[in-house]
Regions:
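Active-site loop/lid in soluble adenylation, ligation, and acyl-transfer enzymes
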Residues: 1-148, 261-289
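Coil-to-beta-strand transition motifs
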Residues: 21, 96-98, 198-202, 214-217
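Intrinsically disordered, low-complexity acidic/polar segments
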Residues: 33, 112-113, 214, 228-230
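Surface-exposed helix-capping loop/turn segments at secondary-structure junctions
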Residues: 60-66, 190-202, 215, 285-289
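Conserved metal-phosphate-binding beta-hairpin within the catalytic cores
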Residues: 103, 202-223
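Anionic ligand-binding catalytic core segments
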Residues: 117-120, 126-175, 219, 223-284
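A long amphipathic alpha-helix within ATP-dependent nucleotide-binding catalytic cores
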Residues: 169-203
Length: 289
């Protein structure tokens, strides 16, 4: 059996080169505030991979994505070991674009903090009088740069995203920046509407895109997982305060309340975290993991 070593290790994912494709493995690691925590969250990698698969299938009519298969039988023998089952995705190779495409449909988190001070979120002027967690009149696109592990992503304007892409792809910056913005908002609207019908509010999320060999923009990375999105229960939703969530916000809140924890979570927080991830998966897909 041929051994494979990751060519890249992110905060949560490991990427393996499979010749004309890549194999992306979602581990059970969890990160918060750009730090990898000491604990593993059992089954988390499976939730991320299967949730992404669901959304990639759901949005394929809107634009192509990089997913080829999540069946380890389609992958080399090395990936048929138990630790890869359910949490591995074979993907097309793309040239990834260095812009994190964030879309916000509700005002919360850092966006709410910024709005209270300036009336703006990432430089975008919003109407007066919005409450915390309120739905925005229209989703807003707030891109950021992609940071290395340990660094913080930096918010940029749409205009700055043109400059970032123009430097890498002369003559194409505006075209690519516009596609990223328009695809991001279209994907969010389609998926947020579906999620609402299943009892979940997608408050915000981020997408990442790449280029195929012909220069077409393709959706990559993960899609609408509890790691990349804020999911709130529709039941009991009321603007004016923070919302309970099915995502990493639960972990962030615990860390904020326990600043001396040294990023070491107690077992009950780990158990509640995976329960929330699995509940979100079941509500959205109608299936158990």
């Amino acid at each position: 059996m041929t051994e494979f070593k990751p060519i890249k290790e992110g905060k949560v994912r490991e990427i393996y080169d499979n010749g004309d494709s890549l194999i992306m493995v979602a581990t059970d690691r969890i990160s918060a505030f750009d730090v990898i925590l000491k604990n593993k969250v059992t089954n988390k990698g499976k939730v991320l991979t299967q949730m992404s698969k669901f959304w990639f299938d759901y949005t394929r009519d809107l634009l192509p994505n990089h997913m080829l298969s999540v069946d380890v039988q389609d992958m080399p023998e090395f990936f048929r070991q138990p630790q890869f089952t359910g949490n591995s995705m074979m993907c097309r190779k793309l040239t990834m674009l260095p812009v994190e495409c964030i879309v916000r449909g509700y005002i919360t988190g850092s966006g709410w903090a910024s709005y209270q001070k300036t009336g703006k979120v990432c430089g975008i002027q919003l109407p007066e009088g919005l409450k915390e967690s309120e739905k925005l009149p229209e989703p807003i696109y707030t891109p950021s740069t992609k940071a290395e592990i340990g660094d913080h992503d930096e918010n940029i304007s749409y205009e700055q995203s043109i400059d970032v892409l123009e430097k890498l792809f002369p003559g194409k910056g505006e075209e690519y920046a516009t596609k990223l913005r328009d695809y991001t908002i279209a994907l969010y609207k389609k998926c947020a509407e579906y999620a609402l019908s299943r009892g979940i509010i997608i408050a915000d999320t981020k997408f990442e895109f790449g280029l195929d060999e012909e220069g077409n923009v393709i959706l990559g990375d993960e899609m609408l997982t509890p790691d990349s999105s804020r999911f709130w229960p529709l039941e009991g939703y009321e603007a004016g305060h923070g919302q309970p969530s099915f995502d990493k916000q639960f972990v962030r809140n615990w860390l904020l309340a326990n600043p001396d924890s040294d990023y070491d979570l107690p077992q009950d927080v780990i158990d509640k975290t995976i329960a929330k991830y699995e509940e979100a998966y079941e509500m959205l897909t109608g299936k158990k993991l």
